């Protein structure tokens, strides 16, 4: 069951759902609009062979950029972080979607789940499928997080729990 704005406001007012900072336009009809944070990550090198199964961390592959603008070259991608630090209830799951207006410029994100019990800034992959460089601004609403009630409760203990700022991928060494 997708949660409407009255239920989202109730979860926030009781402290079960935390969004910090919380803006007047964050809670929407059927989800939360989240803003671009002050840093992003882009690949530091081009034409490099990347073997996730051999990596303990992918952090050296990325360059962290602190800026009020996010520059996404044509047919390239960046990792964005939300300005907001989010703490999900243990019985609510989030489905991250790019705001439709940005998709109409040629930006896309992969299907992304924010697990029940997750806490942290949300790092999201944004791909520019257009032939043009797209420049986004810090603080603009870019991500729409639809929240749904889960049956039962989950205890999240993933690798990205508590992350702050943009977080490059972890390596998959030991999983392959």
From Swiss-Prot:
EC assignment: 3.5.4.13
Pathway: Pyrimidine metabolism; dUMP biosynthesis; dUMP from dCTP (dUTP route): step 1/2
Enzyme class: hydrolase
Active-site residues, Swiss-Prot/TrEMBL: 125 (proton donor/acceptor)
Annotated Pfam families: DCD
SUPFAM superfamilies assigned: dUTPase-like
An example Gene Ontology molecular-function term: nucleotide binding
Superkingdom of this protein's organism: Archaea
Record field: catalytic activity: dCTP + H2O + H(+) = dUTP + NH4(+)
Biological process, per Gene Ontology: dUMP biosynthetic process; dUTP biosynthetic process
Keyword terms of this UniProt record: Hydrolase, Nucleotide metabolism, Nucleotide-binding
CDD domains: trimeric_dUTPase
PANTHER family for this protein: DCTP DEAMINASE
NCBIfam families, alphabetized: dCTP_deam
Entry similarity comment: Belongs to the dCTP deaminase family.
Protein name in the entry: dCTP deaminase
């Amino acid at each position: 069951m997708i949660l409407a704005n009255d239920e989202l406001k109730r979860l926030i007012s009781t402290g079960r759902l935390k969004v910090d900072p919380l803006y007047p336009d964050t809670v929407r009809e059927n989800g939360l609009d989240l803003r671009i944070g002050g840093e992003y990550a882009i690949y530091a090198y081009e034409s490099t062979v990347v073997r996730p199964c051999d990596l303990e961390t992918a952090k050296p592959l990325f360059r962290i950029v602190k800026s009020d603008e996010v520059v996404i070259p044509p047919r390239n991608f960046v990792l964005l972080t939300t300005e907001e630090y989010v703490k999900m209830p243990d019985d609510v799951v989030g489905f991250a979607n790019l705001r439709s207006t940005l998709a109409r410029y040629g930006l896309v994100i992969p299907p992304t789940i924010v697990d029940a019990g997750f806490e942290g800034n949300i790092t999201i992959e944004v791909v520019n499928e257009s032939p043009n460089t797209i420049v986004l601004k810090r603080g603009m609403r870019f991500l729409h997080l639809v929240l749904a009630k889960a049956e039962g409760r989950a205890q999240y203990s993933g690798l990205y729990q508590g992350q702050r700022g943009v977080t490059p991928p972890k390596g998959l060494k030991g999983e392959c």
